């Protein structure tokens, strides 16, 4: 891990991108518009070998750091960002997401408790998203809330499009596995095994909008891939019936919206 220097920012934000020209500009603009004092947040974008106009789009902006990672894969790109990050909290989102203006403020507030090792946020979809997708999104948020708050490490999963981790966690247990998928889930699983006293929390105030999807069937197809790849995590267990019922009950009561 890179040595942490004095007077660091409070939060380092790491965003990998690969051929992300469709949404990258909106992502960068949302991060530059964050409610933050000068020097409080550093923005690190990592180009993972884009062949479209993504690099040119990123070059249009001042106030961000752009790095390059030749090893294919978003987790390799995230690890490159982690190595240079200077803040005690490292936050992650994706190039097809826009963050709320108070996103970093909510992350800082949510991680005030020193027992919180990692934080997962709330995901919305665009205004033109279908009703089934909005319902599916609410269910996924409810699922994250229940798993983070009530389930053991073996059941944990995470999404890097809205996630914050203490830098010390990477120093202690290592970076993301450079897998194609599920390394975010593996990281919080590994944190629970190595640092069981630390909490994984869900904070609905930490909000992003995921621009990639507008139809439920496309998102459901992606979720099936995540479910399949979670099986590569050593010791991972699928949710049991009682856990799934707890999620359903929480969702029916309005959780995740």
Range-by-range predicted roles:
Residues 102-133:
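Conserved donor NDP-sugar-binding/catalytic core segment of glycosyltransferases
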Residues 30, 47-56, 97:
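A conserved acidic beta->alpha catalytic loop
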Residues 200-203, 209-257:
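Active-site-adjacent helix/loop segment of glycosyltransferases
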Residues 125, 146-164, 180, 186:
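A recurrent flexible, glycine/aromatic-enriched loop bordering the glycosyltransferase active site
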Residues 30-40:
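Short, acidic, metal-binding catalytic loop of nucleotide-sugar glycosyltransferases
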Residues 69-85:
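Glycine-rich, basic loop-to-helix element that forms the pyrophosphate-binding segment
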Residues 11-23, 27, 34, 46, ...:
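A conserved hydrophobic helix/loop-capping motif in glycosyltransferases and polysaccharide synthases
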Residues 90:
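Short aromatic/hydrophobic "clamp" motif used to bind/position activated sugar donors
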């Amino acid at each position: 891990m890179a040595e942490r220097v004095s007077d660091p920012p409070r939060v380092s934000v790491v965003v990998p991108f690969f051929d992300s020209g469709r949404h990258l500009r909106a992502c960068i603009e949302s991060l530059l518009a964050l409610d933050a004092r000068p020097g409080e947040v550093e923005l690190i974008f990592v180009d993972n070998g884009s062949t479209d106009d993504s690099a040119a789009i990123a070059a249009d902006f001042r106030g961000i750091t752009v790095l390059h990672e030749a090893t294919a894969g978003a987790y390799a790109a995230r690890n490159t960002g982690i190595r240079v990050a200077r803040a005690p909290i490292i936050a992650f989102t994706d190039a097809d997401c826009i963050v709320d203006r108070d996103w970093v403020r909510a992350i800082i507030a949510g991680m005030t408790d020193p027992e919180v090792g990692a934080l997962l946020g709330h995901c919305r979809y665009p205004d033109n998203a279908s009703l089934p997708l909005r319902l599916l999104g609410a269910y996924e948020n409810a699922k994250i809330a229940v798993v983070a708050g009530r389930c053991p490490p073996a059941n944990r999963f995470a999404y890097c499009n809205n996630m914050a981790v203490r830098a010390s966690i990477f120093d202690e247990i290592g970076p993301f596995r450079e897998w194609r998928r599920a390394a975010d889930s593996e990281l919080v699983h590994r944190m629970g095994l190595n640092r069981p006293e630390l909490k994984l929390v869900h904070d609905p105030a930490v909000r992003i909008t995921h621009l990639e999807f507008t139809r439920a069937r496309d998102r459901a197809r992606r979720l099936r891939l995540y479910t399949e790849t979670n099986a590569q995590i050593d010791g991972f267990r699928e949710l049991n019936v009682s856990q799934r019922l707890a999620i359903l009950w929480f969702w029916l009561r309005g959780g995740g919206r």
